[in-house]
């Protein structure tokens, strides 16, 4: 008789424990129900990037002195700088500057070490193309002013800040 009573008590304890675990899982599910959705409708909604975001590189042709510091600090020697030495004034004249964004790792070393600040990072991150050769930007494409998402009235911008719990 006693083994039957102990088995029944064991069964009751296991039932209570299982109900408690199910209740804990349900409480976690309910706590997540009040949160905002994580997904965004991408073409129509875009996240506002942070101030230090590393997007497409912007290049100012007039400021560049063709010192090639950007090439030396790049971990993959990516920027292609073509220049000609002007013998009468003993200065380099920049002929062509290009970066292949298909290879670029967006480390930002070229921007950080540029002595004339002719390179800067923008908030543009939409660089996808159907042909990888279109990702090779010359000085004209690099000099194009960045498109700001904040100024586009057709796109709903979403601030990407962590929630502060009070």
UniProtKB/Swiss-Prot annotation:
This is NAD(P)H-quinone oxidoreductase subunit I, chloroplastic. Its cofactor is [4Fe-4S] cluster. Signal peptide: none annotated. NCBIfam families: ndhI (TIGR00403), NuoI (TIGR01971), PRK05888.1-3 (NF004537). Binds 2 [4Fe-4S] clusters per subunit. Residues 55-84, 95-124 form the 4Fe-4S ferredoxin-type domain. [4Fe-4S] cluster 2 binds at residues 74, 104, 107, 110. NDH shuttles electrons from NAD(P)H:plastoquinone, via FMN and iron-sulfur (Fe-S) centers, to quinones in the photosynthetic chain and possibly in a chloroplast respiratory chain. The immediate electron acceptor for the enzyme in this species is believed to be plastoquinone. Couples the redox reaction to proton translocation, and thus conserves the redox energy in a proton gradient. [4Fe-4S] cluster 1 binds at residues 64, 67, 70, 114. NDH is composed of at least 16 different subunits, 5 of which are encoded in the nucleus. It comes from the Eukaryota. Pfam families: Fer4. It comes from Trilisa paniculata (Hairy chaffhead). Keywords: 4Fe-4S, Chloroplast, Iron, Iron-sulfur, Membrane, Metal-binding, NAD, NADP, Plastid, Plastoquinone, Quinone, Repeat, Thylakoid, Translocase. Its EC number is 7.1.1.-. It is an enzyme of class 7 (translocase). Belongs to the complex I 23 kDa subunit family. It is found in: Plastid, Chloroplast thylakoid membrane. PANTHER family: NAD(P)H-QUINONE OXIDOREDUCTASE SUBUNIT I, CHLOROPLASTIC. It catalyses: a plastoquinone + NADH + (n+1) H(+)(in) = a plastoquinol + NAD(+) + n H(+)(out); a plastoquinone + NADPH + (n+1) H(+)(in) = a plastoquinol + NADP(+) + n H(+)(out). Transmembrane segments: none annotated. One of its GO terms (biological process) is photosynthesis, light reaction. GO terms for molecular function: 4 iron, 4 sulfur cluster binding; iron ion binding; NADH dehydrogenase (ubiquinone) activity; quinone binding. The lineage of its organism: Eukaryota, Viridiplantae, Streptophyta, Embryophyta, Tracheophyta. GO terms for cellular component: chloroplast thylakoid membrane. It is a peripheral membrane protein. Disulfide bonds: none annotated.
């Amino acid at each position: 008789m006693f083994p039957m009573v102990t088995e029944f008590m064991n069964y009751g304890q296991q039932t209570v424990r299982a109900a408690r675990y199910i209740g804990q899982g349900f409480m976690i599910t309910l706590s997540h129900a009040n949160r905002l959705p994580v997904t965004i409708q991408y073409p129509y909604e875009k996240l506002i990037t942070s101030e230090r975001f590393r997007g497409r590189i912007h290049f100012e042709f007039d400021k560049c002195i063709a010192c090639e510091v950007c090439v030396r600090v790049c971990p993959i020697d990516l920027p292609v700088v073509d220049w000609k030495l002007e013998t009468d004034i003993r200065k380099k004249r920049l002929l062509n500057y290009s970066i292949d964004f298909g290879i670029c790792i967006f480390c930002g070393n070229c921007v950080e070490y540029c002595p004339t600040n002719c390179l800067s990072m923008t908030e543009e991150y939409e660089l996808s193309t159907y042909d990888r050769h279109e990702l090779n930007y010359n000085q004209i494409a690099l000099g194009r002013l960045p498109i700001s998402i904040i100024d586009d009235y057709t796109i709903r911008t979403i601030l990407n800040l962590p929630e502060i719990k009070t």
